[in-house]
Amino acid sequence: MSFVWFLVGFAAMVVFASFFEWTLHRFVLHRPLWFFRYPFNAHAMVHHRAFRADRTYHVQNRTDEGKIPMNWWNGPALILAGCLPFTGLAAFISWWFLLGAFAAACGYYTTYEYLHWCMHKPQHRLVERSGIFFVLNGHHLLHHRYMHKNFNVVLPLADLCLNTLLVRSKVCFAQARGDHVPDVQPRARSDT
């Protein structure tokens, strides 16, 4: 039974993490909080200024590489914060539930950082050749064009459920190009 609770905790955290990522991204990384401006400054003011939806979506110089990932201490802090609701539930259900949630939270954060790195610094890695990465890269590219849309990087479930999902641009723009970057321009209208 313990392995079942591990799997339930893991699956529940994957879904929860999509909404946690969305909430953090929308309300903390894109809005200055009067008592804690660091996340907004690091993300909206530094990351989004360095990486736009045009050719600058990809690293232009080595100094920009440090503007891709979050600071090292963000990972443990976010993983622990995300696991807090699961800790209370685990006290009543099973500690295996929390262990599964913790494993998923670690995997989700690691996946976030790795995919985000590959999106902004492409090097024809194996993951970059996958169809899932192709779709997620277009999703994230549109976020850099429309910062009020597409808050998820790993699993756009929350974007879908909370009506912030955008699959194509509404207007033409000079978007980033590359082997693993989809065309997110508006579809051409047919005259038929």
Predicted stretch roles:
Residues 6-11, 98-102:
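Hydrophobic alpha-helical transmembrane segments
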Residues 1-4:
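Short, strongly hydrophobic alpha-helical membrane anchors
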Residues 17-102, 106-182:
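Membrane-embedded catalytic scaffold of the fatty acid hydroxylase/desaturase
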Residues 183-192:
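A membrane-cytosol interface segment of integral membrane proteins
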